[in-house]
Structures are given as structure tokens and as C-alpha cells.
Amino acid sequence: MDHLSYSQFSTYTKCPRSWYLGKLRQAEEKQTWYIPIGSAVHDMIEAYLLGRPLEPAGGISAEQFFYPLIEKQMLIEPDLTKWLAGGPETAPVTHEKALQRAVDCFEKAVEELEAIDVWEVEYDASGRLPGLSVPIKAFIDIIGEHKTKGPVIWDWKTGSTKPDNFQLQT
């Protein structure tokens, strides 16, 4: 292993067996709807911050970011009914609802960004920690200053799970 990411460390601390199977044995993960939602939103925000215009001006559209991720996952598991979904069991977030969730999360992020002077996008904070034999690979989504709250370090999250402070403490 040439490096360790925060998410790998987090997986290991929660479930060492899951980390072992996924990272060392390269076991195939079950496909999900929430991974392409989060990835599409993250990529759309990055494109927005790098100056791409929003739709309908021929710019950022959720479909352009979301559907290629779905197609890639379908190469692994083409049966969408086997994919894990978020939301309530009676109304799971799949298909069009998943795309709409990506749109909603992106629009909320753009709204929140209006109050932030962005200094860095995808800042490379990789390095070494004492006692760890492999380097830590770390990219910070946003570094900037909120107009009323001061300096911010932001990690985009599209789900209900909020990041813990270990990311910033390292």
C-alpha cells in the first residue's frame, strides 16, 4: 500500500474486516445510488468553483455528471434492483429521485457558497503522520472565509452522516 486516505482510515477504525476485504483483497463492493449522487455533486461543485457556468446557459447540468457514473456502475452490476438505496424503504432514493437529490444538494451548495470567499479548491494536504509507515493522502474540498463566520475548511457531504473532527485534527 503506497498511501492511506482519511476514508480508508475511517473504514478501518469502524470495521477492520471491511477495510481488509475492500482494500487488500479488492473484493467487489455492492453498488449503491448514494455514491454517484455524492460524486456527481462533488464534481459539479468543483466545476462551478472553477468557473463553469450553470444550466441553462450550456454549462453544468446534473445529468452530465450523474449518468456517466451510473453507467460505470452498471458495468459491475446491471440489475438496478440489487443496488443499495438511501431514504425510507417505502420511497427509496433511486433513479429520478437520486438525480433530483444530486440537483437539490448542488443547488444548496451554490446557495451556501455565496457567503464564502473561496481561497483553495481541492487543496492537497497530503503528508506523513508520526507512527504511520505510509503517507496520508488528503484533499480538502474548500478552504476559504465565510463572510460572517470567518475561515472555513469544508468537506462536502450529501448524506445525513456528518464528518467527524478527526479529518481536521490530522
PLM region descriptions:
Residues 29-33, 58, 113-117, 134, ...:
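Short, surface-exposed helix-loop/turn micro-motifs enriched in polar/charged residues
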Residues 44-124:
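A non-catalytic, helix-rich entry segment at domain boundaries
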